[in-house]
Amino acid sequence: EVPDLFFFLPSNPQYKVWAGLGVLLPLDDLVKDTKYVKEIFESDQYKTTTVNGEHYFVPLISMQNSHAIYYRKDWLDKLGMEEPKTLDEFESMLKAFTENDPDGNGQNDTYGISLSKVSGWLSSLYSTFGVRPGWNKAGDKYEAYYMTDEYKNMLAWLADMYSEGYIQKEYFLNTDQQKLENFYAGKAGLTFANSGSSVDGIVSKVKEANQNAEVDVL
């Protein structure tokens, strides 16, 4: 006994075996009178998932980015700055978090961004630079997103931020937990982390270290 519907990744070739055995129902006749799904079935990207010219599943619409940029709003207020709306304003915030003593302790001991060696968190910056995750059509070819000019521009910008000292120098040694601990402890004014249900937990951890701290999300 098998379920009527199930989730499956097209990268797993098992579905082709099941389709060949007649276990799966081809969906082409069921969607021929639709507009949106039929267009997907006929797209170039979807042709590689057919078995003998027939389709056996529809794509799942999922959220590309569930990450958020957390920052110390109390630091921004203390420095007399508004929430950044442009990349230039974002850079100005990082500079101020690094150079203008936002925690008020009279020491040069803060920096703009706390990162880890896991690069996936950078997806929060993708839209700023026009990066589209996955494979992008370039003429008659497809190009992985990390090979695009947009992604390279993002890396070049991050390299500039690193050379300016706005990113922790040893970030590549950090685990994700260490990245967060630096933010909790007030060493950095900004970090990347999960959104949704994670927000309350991150805010409470920051307030454990400093009850007057305020955290907001970009």
Model-predicted regions and their roles:
Residues 1-218:
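Extracytoplasmic/secretory soluble proteins
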